[in-house]
From Swiss-Prot:
Keywords: Hydrolase, Magnesium, Multifunctional enzyme, Nucleotidyltransferase, Repeat, Transferase. Its cofactor is Mg(2+). Belongs to the GlnD family. This is Bifunctional uridylyltransferase/uridylyl-removing enzyme. CDD domains: ACT_ACR-UUR-like_2 (cd04899), ACT_UUR-like_1 (cd04900), HDc (cd00077), NT_GlnE_GlnD_like (cd05401). Residues 325-681 are annotated as: Uridylyl-removing. One of its GO terms (molecular function) is phosphoric diester hydrolase activity. Modifies, by uridylylation and deuridylylation, the PII regulatory proteins (GlnB and homologs), in response to the nitrogen status of the cell that GlnD senses through the glutamine level. Under low glutamine levels, catalyzes the conversion of the PII proteins and UTP to PII-UMP and PPi, while under higher glutamine levels, GlnD hydrolyzes PII-UMP to PII and UMP (deuridylylation). Thus, controls uridylylation state and activity of the PII proteins, and plays an important role in the regulation of nitrogen assimilation and metabolism. Residues 682-763, 790-858 form the ACT domain. It catalyses: [protein-PII]-L-tyrosine + UTP = [protein-PII]-uridylyl-L-tyrosine + diphosphate; [protein-PII]-uridylyl-L-tyrosine + H2O = [protein-PII]-L-tyrosine + UMP + H(+).
Length: 858
């Protein structure tokens, strides 16, 4: 807001009048959405209001008031900025400045978000030459009021100075940089309707470039010019209209400028389009799918148009580089180009051949505009007969089986809609959202991300990222079977029913139709069926229990299946969200792989042999640390078998070295160190046991912003608790070595206090969790041996959640024997092993479950 005096009664009256007229327009739009009429009406309303203020300020006729940007186009969104330039003659007196400032202040008083500049023609041209954003804004300049001669002089000077080639280069670079900010994908779960790839800004960029080059300023003019076809022009107009309408609705719903389609507004936006929820899909999911298809079409057509404009602005000095396929494809300027527009109609099998050539031909960096257009216009060719053609099936398998280029080929097949035309069930999940609180990609993008992750394991340049996975896939015969499993593992999402079971049927049919038989087909189908199994065992079950390992080994059956499942599982978790994967989950999976591999190799998974092996390894490490012989006995004699099975040899040795002198300590022993697996802090607590101990430790972690990844709780024979926690601090970058001493001191002090447990802090839920809350679930049941009770908790993640659970357990004097904390993005699925005298009482179980549900409710 400007710093001028408070608005006069006349100004307040003008503002009220302007607001009333605008409100009436927005109401009409709510009931009869014609976005073009709304934007033009808002522009005219603003023009008229500014003209009145201009006249009232008595500004001389030698000046001109010019609208620029979207306002200059006459396309004003409900709460967009109003960008104007006060154009001055070459010479003006200082007294004029005060009158111009008064005009701008009065424009603000109307309630407009004014973006203003005051320049001479020469200053405009100079600014435009230095800043492509200014140059772009002035490209759409429109006179509102004032000197026509001055505005025409500006227009002539502007176009004389405009270098269409330099403008093209700058705008394409700007578009690439903008796309990079959105990870080069239109499939964000909260896209920016204006700025994201495939959004309105892409369409505007094309029209700016075309206008600067003199090719036209509308889709019809570009059609007339031959840069696009009539069909493409219609498609562009249709999607542009949808995106403009969506943006305007977001503004109206939010009551302010709002270009990001955030979770909070998706349902309201969907309802404003008339979408209704069904049993299978929320209204918001239907809207988002429509958005993703529009963004995808815009991305495809924008690529075609930019290449065509570039060809006109920069005529190629050389033509065909080489012939790639007789009568079908050539390479031209590094792009794969069809020899004529009828190639796909004459040779439908050339559609998939294009992607095989793109994948296998060095130097080819993409498909030319001509090829993309032909693909776009060949959708009717990709029918059932085309899908069943043995030659096409063979080509598809060749694409899958190439040593490199697979990820790029499949991404391009998806971008051009060919993948969904070939695999109809894949088409069903294109643009499908996942409201499970941990996938941040649509289903099709997640599948392609998993495929990409598996491929990266096999690429030497990426071997340093996941060395163990790279080692395994290097020895894995026919890795293409993993790629097929990746394509089908989530292909049945959103159909209702178990997507693993439904996906099995799809995978089995694919194998049968593509000549995949024997063990390869069996492996692919089995992987789709069991793609969640290894993750569930590693993260939710007690893998120190030999029976758990034995059952898992029976499911897997052999080393090839185990390796395949491990590689798919790592790729799958990493493909859900950058936040879900961490080194701790990696260690859990790798440990499960190695233990199971030993069992499959003939090792006997009995507790006694494993106990003896770990103790011997730990003793060897203690000797290296110069711990006296037999010094370990004082501690080990107090520990049960479970302790040795829950910790590896290195961890047992570290804990022994810390505690062997303090077995009967009177005060708490707390030690912390950076976790050996990295990216976390390991905290050891050794103290006389008490019912509220676990809750007290969790309270400390909660208050200090530390998230618990894993808790392993042991009780010695002489009544001490030996608890180990793996914690992380996710809110900021932290060097765990630097905070280890502080954690030791603070937690030891906290455990020495006798204060009662504090009330849990109910931290704010994330926006995603608020929009898509899950129903909290609590399940309490005895384990198979009747020794412990297993408590399973599923809820939205939030700060203080673990402590809230621990506090309820402490109030009922229930001991926590072990805890497995499994955070999946915005959702937690925690498992606790409990011991308590009253847990067999049905009434106590009901009371406990009720209180836990109350504690974790949002």
């Amino acid at each position: 807001m400007s710093a001028h005096a408070a608005p006069s009664p006349e100004a307040l009256s003008r503002r009220a009048e302007f607001k009333a007229a605008k409100t009436e327009m927005l109401e009409r739009f709510r009931h009869a959405a014609n976005v073009a009429s709304l934007m033009h009406a808002l522009s005219k309303l603003t023009d008229d209001a500014l003209k009145r203020v201009w006249d009232e300020c008595g500004l001389p006729a030698t000046l001109a008031l010019v609208a620029v940007g979207g306002y200059g186009r006459g396309e004003l969104a409900p709460y967009s900025d109003v960008d104007i330039v006060v154009l001055l003659p070459d010479a003006h007196d200082a007294a004029l400045d005060a009158r111009i400032e008064r005009f701008i202040g009065m424009a603000w008083d109307l309630g407009l978000e004014i973006g203003s500049s005051v320049r001479t023609v020469a200053q405009c041209i100079e600014e435009a030459s230095q800043d492509v954003t200014v140059q772009t804004s002035l490209l759409e300049a429109r006179r509102i009021v004032g000197s026509t001669a001055l505005f025409e002089r500006f227009t002539v000077r502007y176009h004389e100075a405009l270098d269409a080639r330099a403008f093209f280069t700058a705008k394409v670079l700007e578009m690439r940089q903008r796309h990079a900010k959105f990870q080069d994908t239109p499939y964000s779960l909260e896209p920016n309707v204006k700025e994201s790839p495939g959004g309105l800004r892409d369409l505007q960029t094309i029209l700016w470039i075309a206008r600067a080059a003199g090719f036209g300023s509308s889709w019809r003019e570009l059609d007339t010019r031959g840069l696009i076809t009539d069909r493409e022009a219609r498609e562009l107009r249709r999607n542009e209209g949808f995106l403009k309408t969506l943006r305007a609705r977001l503004h109206v719903i939010a009551g302010r400028r709002q270009d990001m389609l955030v979770f909070d507004l998706q349902t309201q936006a969907a309802e404003s389009f008339g979408y209704q929820p069904t049993q299978a899909k929320r209204a918001s999911e239907q809207l988002m799918r429509r958005y993703y298809w529009a963004a995808k079409a815009v991305t495809q057509l924008a690529t075609i148009l930019i290449q065509n404009i570039e060809a006109q602005l920069f005529p190629a000095t050389s033509g065909i580089t080489r012939v790639l396929s007789a009568d079908r494809f050539v390479e031209k300027q590094g792009m794969l180009e069809i020899v004529d527009d009828g190639v796909f109609e004459r040779h439908p099998d050339a559609i998939l051949e294009a992607f095989l050539l793109y994948e296998t031909t060095r130097g080819v960096k993409g498909l030319s505009a001509r090829t993309l257009r032909a693909l776009y216009n060949s959708r009717e060719i990709m029918n059932n007969a085309w899908r069943r053609d043995p030659q096409n099936r063979a080509t598809f398998m060749r694409i899958l089986q190439q040593p490199e280029g697979i990820t790029h080929a499949f991404r391009l097949m998806n971008q051009t809609s060919v993948l969904g035309r070939y695999l109809l069930n894949f088409r069903r999940i294109v643009g499908q959202m996942q409201h499970d609180l941990y996938h941040v990609y649509t289903v099709d993008q997640h599948i392609l991300m998993v495929l990409r992750n598996i491929r990266r394991f096999a690429v030497a340049e990426h071997a340093h990222e996941y060395p163990f996975c790279s080692q395994l896939i290097g020895n894995f015969e026919r890795p293409w079977a993993l790629y097929v499993a990746a394509l089908f593992h989530d292909i049945a999402k959103g159909r209702g029913g178990d997507h693993s079971t439904l996906g099995m049927a799809d995978a089995r049919r694919f194998c049968r139709e593509h000549g995949i038989a024997g063990d390869d087909a069996a492996l692919i189908v089995w992987l789709v069926q069991h793609h969640l199994t290894m993750s569930q065992v590693a993260q939710k079950q007690d893998t120190s229990d030999p029976e758990v390992i034995k059952r898992f080994a029976e499911v897997v059956g052999n080393e090839r299946y185990l390796t395949a499942l491990y590689l798919l599982t790592v790729a799958d978790i990493r493909g859900t969200s950058p936040k879900v994967w961490n080194t701790w989950k990696g260690k859990l999976l790798e440990d499960l792989y190695r233990i199971t591999l030993a069992v499959l190799g003939g090792a006997n998974p009995d507790a006694h042999s494993e106990l003896k092996s770990r103790q011997e390894q730990a003793l060897a490490l203690l000797r290296l640390e110069t711990v006296p012989d037999d010094a370990h006995r004082a501690l080990w004699d107090q520990l049960d078998v479970g302790f040795f099975l829950r910790h590896d040899a290195a961890d047992i040795a570290w804990q022994t070295r810390v505690l062997y002198r303090h077995v009967n300590a009177e005060t708490a022993i707390v030690r912390a160190r950076p976790s050996p697996i990295g990216d976390a802090l390991q905290v050891l607590v050794y103290v006389k046991d008490r019912p509220d101990l676990f809750a007290g430790i969790c309270a400390y972690f909660d208050r200090n912003g530390l998230s618990v990844l894993d808790a392993r709780v042991s009780t010695t024979r002489h009544g001490y608790a030996l608890d180990n926690f793996i914690v992380t601090q996710t809110e900021r970058d932290v060097r765990y070595r630097d905070i280890a001493n502080l954690v030791e001191q603070q937690l030891a002090t906290r455990l020495a206090e006798t204060a009662s447990l504090p009330e849990p802090s109910k931290g704010r839920l994330s926006r995603l969790s608020r929009t898509f809350p899950i129903t909290p679930r609590v399940d309490l049941r005895a384990d198979e041996r009747g020794q412990y009770y297993i408590l399973s908790v599923s809820a939205n993640d939030r700060p203080g959640l673990l402590y809230s659970i621990a506090r309820v357990l402490a109030e009922h004097r229930i001991g926590v024997h072990a805890a497995r904390i499994n955070t999946l993005g915005e959702r937690v699925e925690d498992i606790f092993l409990l011991a308590g005298a009253g847990l067999s009482d049905n009434r106590l179980q009901i009371q406990l479950e009720t209180e836990l549900l109350r504690a974790i409710a949002v």
